[in-house]
């Protein structure tokens, strides 16, 4: 009998200890009506955080006869010196240069399906093999010149591939055909 009294007392003590450490449930934020208002309310529409007033000065890029291809394509065409600097940056970061070309469409297009897929213009034909071990930017530009001679009506882009993470890190147009 003493053992049963002892165990029930232990259970009761534990139950009280657990109830003492309970936290009250969240009941919401308190009203700020009790606090004095220290600033006047500005009902002017220009004080509301919005970019609605700025929309009038934004412009849309005209897509007719002015297609854009990659991130740097909104800038003027890169000169040979600028291309050399971009390729040097690519090599300095340890990325593998790779050339790709496209003979028909230099931009994303959807011909076979409305959803993105393999044949929507994102995947171009690779020029030779990736230039593993390349440390000279002029070698990459020499390959660009060779690709231009072989396909003068093609778009040519240079890609920097990180072979450790297996991702494409940089991509830019190195050559566009006449009229684009």
Curated annotation (Swiss-Prot):
GO molecular function: ribulose-bisphosphate carboxylase activity
Keywords: Calvin cycle, Carbon dioxide fixation, Chloroplast, Photorespiration, Photosynthesis, Plastid, Transit peptide
Pfam families documented for this protein: RbcS, RuBisCO_small
UniProt-annotated location(s): Plastid, Chloroplast
Annotated InterPro entries: RuBisCO_ssu, RuBisCO_ssu_dom, RuBisCO_ssu_N, RuBisCO_ssu_sf
CC per GO annotation: chloroplast
Broad class of where this protein is predominantly found: plastid
Further comment found in the protein's record: The basic functional RuBisCO is composed of a large chain homodimer in a 'head-to-tail' conformation. In form I RuBisCO this homodimer is arranged in a barrel-like tetramer with the small subunits forming a tetrameric 'cap' on each end of the 'barrel'.
Record's subunit section: Heterohexadecamer of 8 large and 8 small subunits.
HAMAP family in alphabetical order: RuBisCO_S_bact
Role according to the record: RuBisCO catalyzes two reactions: the carboxylation of D-ribulose 1,5-bisphosphate, the primary event in carbon dioxide fixation, as well as the oxidative fragmentation of the pentose substrate. Both reactions occur simultaneously and in competition at the same active site. Although the small subunit is not catalytic it is essential for maximal activity.
Family per similarity comment: Belongs to the RuBisCO small chain family.
Protein name according to UniProt: Ribulose bisphosphate carboxylase small subunit, chloroplastic 5
Organism: Solanum tuberosum (Potato)
């Amino acid at each position: 009998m003493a053992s049963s009294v002892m165990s029930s007392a232990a259970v009761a003590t534990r139950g009280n200890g657990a109830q003492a450490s309970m936290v009250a449930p969240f009941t919401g934020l308190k009203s700020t009506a009790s606090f004095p208002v220290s600033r006047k309310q500005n009902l002017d529409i220009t004080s509301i955080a919005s970019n609605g007033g700025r929309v009038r000065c934004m412009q849309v890029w005209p897509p007719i006869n002015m297609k854009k291809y990659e991130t740097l394509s909104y800038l003027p065409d890169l000169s040979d010196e600028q291309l050399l600097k971009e390729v040097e940056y690519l090599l300095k970061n340890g990325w593998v240069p790779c050339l790709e070309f496209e003979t028909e469409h230099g931009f994303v297009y959807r011909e076979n399906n409305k959803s993105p897929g393999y044949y929507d213009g994102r995947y171009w034909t690779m020029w030779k093999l990736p230039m593993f071990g390349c440390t000279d930017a002029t070698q990459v530009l020499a390959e660009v010149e060779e690709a231009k001679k072989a396909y003068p009506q093609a778009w040519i882009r240079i890609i920097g591939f990180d072979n450790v993470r297996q991702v494409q890190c940089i991509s830019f147009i190195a050559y566009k055909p006449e009229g684009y």
